[in-house]
Regions:
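Extracytoplasmic/secreted cell-surface and envelope-processing proteins
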Residues: 13-15, 31-32, 101-110, 134-139, ...
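Mature extracellular/periplasmic domains of secretome proteins
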Residues: 80-88, 113-123
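A generic structural motif
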Residues: 96, 117-131, 150-154
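Active-site alpha-helical elements of protease catalytic centers
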Residues: 214-227
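Structured segments of extracytoplasmic/periplasmic soluble domains
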Residues: 2, 11, 226-234
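Noncatalytic luminal/extracellular "stalk/propeptide" segments of secretory-pathway proteins
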Residues: 1-92, 96-104
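Loop/turn elements at helix/coil->beta-strand transitions in domains of secreted/extracellular proteins
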Residues: 88-92, 122-125, 189-193, 238-239
Length: 239
């Protein structure tokens, strides 16, 4: 992407436009700005309290029978084949998330959702039930799974029969930015310290639930902005 001088004054770190840059880039983003509802046997659960919707979940509306997956099927070699056999086409499959993490995270950095959920074309919905509720994230919103995926804690019943789901999502092209700023060193301008941060766990999940990323990496961004403010007032020896 082309890097162009930024006109955002609060990012300014020097006296000339060449010292501050903004890089625009486009990327797909699964926007979940509409309905997010999960009703279990007539009881409406509370989004972000009783469950969280995974950020890659597509639009879905309907009622499904609930089934509970036996832990013996949480095998990386057979999981996808069994789940996609057709027997779960109109089912909401509840799986043991804690056991899933133990058996399916086969190597560091594995993208488990892409590896095990994206290939499934014959599953109505997936509910990952664990002891603790996984916080809402937005970092994996550049793709869709074929079905909605929910995270729930131990309060999710072990004997549910029906779930009603209403999720509104839209894959859009989003304008993102990389901000690049430069402060020259007072004694050794040819030598550099490079400080970087990323801020991707923010977003909207439903009409009234806004996440500012404070549960994850917005703290790193805040730290970097404070460092920039400090070094703007106190020029460092190194760039």
């Amino acid at each position: 992407s082309e890097i162009v001088p930024s006109d955002a004054g609060r990012w300014w770190s020097g006296t000339g436009a060449e010292l501050s840059y903004m890089q625009h880039f486009r990327h797909p983003l699964n926007a979940q700005r509409g309905a997010v509802e999960l009703i279990v046997d007539g009881k409406k659960l509370v989004n972000t309290v009783d469950y969280t919707l995974k950020e890659f979940s597509p639009t879905y509306k309907g009622e499904l029978e609930v089934v509970y997956l036996d832990n013996k099927h949480l095998d990386p070699n057979t999981f996808c084949k069994y789940m996609d056999s057709g027997k779960f086409r109109n089912k909401a499959v509840v799986l043991d998330w804690d056991r899933f993490k133990e058996t399916m995270f086969t190597f560091p950095g594995i993208e488990v959702y892409k590896t095990y959920f994206v290939p499934l074309k014959n599953v109505g919905a997936i509910i990952c039930r664990g002891e603790e509720l996984l916080p809402y994230f937005k970092s994996r919103n550049h793709f869709n799974t074929p079905m909605p995926v929910f995270m729930a804690d131990a309060s999710f019943p072990l004997d549910a029969r029906k779930v009603s789901i209403n999720v509104e999502a839209e894959m859009i092209e989003n304008d993102g930015h990389n901000i690049i700023a430069y402060i020259p060193g007072s004694k050794h301008p040819e030598k550099h310290f490079i400080l970087a941060c990323h801020y991707d766990h923010l977003g909207i999940c439903g009409q009234n639930d806004i996440f500012y990323g404070a549960n994850d990496n917005s703290s790193g961004t805040a730290m970097l902005l404070n460092l920039m403010r400090h070094f703007k007032a106190n020029q460092p020896e190194y760039s």
